[in-house]
């Protein structure tokens, strides 16, 4: 089972585009080439596509990587059309990096080919954030009903919210009281998130999870079983490792098979025509030798690990990307985000600026929000620290994030300062204002902004600097 965390094998890649590389397959596809300056402001350019079979295979790998990874993840994600709920994360977890301590996940892999599925989100108390994210088979986020905007149409504006999730080509009638969520692929990943507020809140959130309803349309509101939630399960990074172990013939055979059930988007027609020249088609088989496929796969993998995303933004040292979640024909970005961790949110739902730092003995840092300049969000925000391997920072105070659970206290001038350091700062720092980091070595901070407001998305609000005091 996989959640939208970076798998352990990718733990050095701390943010979208953070360990970025060259152009590789992007140029061969005629996509925007990447700048190489530190500020990433270089103008983009295009390069004619290569007709070499190895280059085509490399580009096909970048194109198809999210599809294959999604399919392998689906196989490890439990029975189709049933919820599986995540265990509450703990600081001792070492299988998953960059743990999210703010929400619990509920996932279901939907097979929409036989008929539509119905999802009902129960009444949840005002102020508790939730998000139901629907990804197509290519890892694009297509729908995102949430507590901040349930996105209902021709249906009651009050909970419970009932959604009819339909596959491509469905032409039935939407029952009264339901909002249709049309998906472009028969395979759909439903990834739900519900805010939880520490250990004492876990049982309450579990109760909410078990009130989520999911069932085929044919048995909805009938005597049929409503597809109750599955057992709690732990996360795993196995799918990425499994795809990483595939050779060229295996990968491209899998890609062709999955495309037969989940065709590419109509905007991908030029890429698909090019791939067809070496037999990579929906339901097809590659027509070039295995050594060419293996060489192309190796080049494609190298392209992903060397890709520099020109759309990544730097703001006072923080790195983030406002172009993720839905990718259009930006195949390198789509593949890179999938490699970092499937399930990236649309920016309107969440933005995760990340910054790296280096502690040396008694190093002290701080993050200061100016008066009335706390992160502008429609839900909530948190700041979490990670060690050099992207695990939570072990500390005797068991403080791993700030901003969400304990209210922050402004100083006399209205500013709010977070002390970022290993040593306990003492009584002069209010409760909730200390974020422990490692005593020495590399560390990173992630600022999670849930339902960011327009001022975040248009750049009018900036993340404050991480200042080193000693």
Residue ranges and their predicted role:
Residues 20, 33, 60-63:
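Short alpha-helical scaffold segments that flank and stabilize functional sites
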Residues 45-470:
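A compositional/structural signature for long, glycine/proline-rich flexible linkers
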Residues 1-30:
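N-terminal secretory signal peptides
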Residues 39-41:
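Ser/Thr/Pro/Gly-rich low-complexity linker/stalk segments immediately outside membranes or between
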Residues 35-37:
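Bacterial signal peptide processing site
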């Amino acid at each position: 089972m996989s959640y939208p965390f970076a798998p352990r094998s990718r733990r050095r890649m701390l943010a979208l585009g953070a360990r970025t590389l060259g152009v590789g397959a992007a140029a061969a596809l005629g996509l925007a080439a990447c700048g190489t300056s530190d500020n990433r402001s270089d103008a983009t350019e295009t390069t004619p596509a290569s007709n070499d079979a190895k280059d085509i295979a490399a580009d096909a790998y970048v194109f198809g990587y999210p599809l294959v990874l999604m399919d392998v993840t689906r196989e490890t994600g439990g029975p189709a059309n049933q919820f599986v709920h995540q265990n509450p994360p703990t600081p001792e977890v070492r299988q998953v990096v960059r743990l999210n301590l703010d929400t619990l996940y509920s996932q279901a892999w939907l097979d929409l080919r036989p008929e539509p599925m119905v999802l009902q989100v129960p009444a949840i108390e005002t102020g508790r954030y939730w998000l139901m994210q629907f990804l197509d088979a290519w890892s694009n986020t297509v729908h995102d009903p949430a507590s901040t905007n349930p996105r209902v149409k021709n249906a009651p504006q009050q909970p419970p919210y009932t959604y009819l999730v339909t596959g491509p080509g469905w032409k039935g009638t939407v029952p009264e009281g339901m909002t249709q969520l049309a998906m472009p692929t028969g395979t759909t990943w439903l990834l739900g998130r519900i805010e939880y507020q520490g250990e004492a809140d876990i049982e309450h959130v579990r109760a909410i999870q078990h009130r989520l309803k999911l069932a085929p349309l044919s048995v909805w509101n009938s005597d049929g079983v409503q597809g109750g939630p599955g057992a709690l399960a732990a996360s795993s990074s196995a799918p990425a490792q499994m795809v990483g172990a595939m050779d060229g013939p295996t990968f491209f055979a899998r890609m062709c098979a999955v495309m037969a059930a989940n065709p590419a988007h109509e905007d991908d027609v030029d890429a698909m025509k090019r791939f067809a020249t070496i037999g990579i088609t929906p339901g097809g088989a590659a027509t070039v030798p295995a050594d060419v496929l293996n060489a192309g796969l190796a080049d494609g993998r190298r392209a992903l690990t060397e890709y520099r995303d020109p759309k990544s933004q730097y703001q006072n040292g923080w790195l983030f990307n406002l172009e993720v979640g839905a990718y259009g024909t930006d195949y390198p970005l789509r593949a890179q985000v999938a490699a970092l961790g499937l399930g990236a949110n649309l920016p309107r739902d969440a933005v995760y600026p990340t910054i790296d730092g280096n502690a040396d003995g008694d190093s002290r840092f701080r993050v200061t929000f100016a008066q009335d300049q706390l992160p502008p969000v429609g839900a909530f925000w948190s700041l979490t620290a990670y060690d050099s391997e992207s695990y939570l920072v072990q500390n005797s105070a068991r403080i791993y994030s700030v901003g969400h659970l304990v209210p922050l206290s402004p100083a006399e001038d209205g500013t709010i300062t977070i002390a970022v350091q290993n040593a306990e700062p003492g009584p002069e720092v209010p409760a909730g204002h200390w974020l422990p980091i490692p005593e020495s070595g590399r560390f990173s901070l992630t600022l999670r902004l849930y339902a960011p407001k327009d001022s975040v998305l248009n750049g009018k609000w900036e993340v404050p600097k991480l200042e080193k005091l000693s």
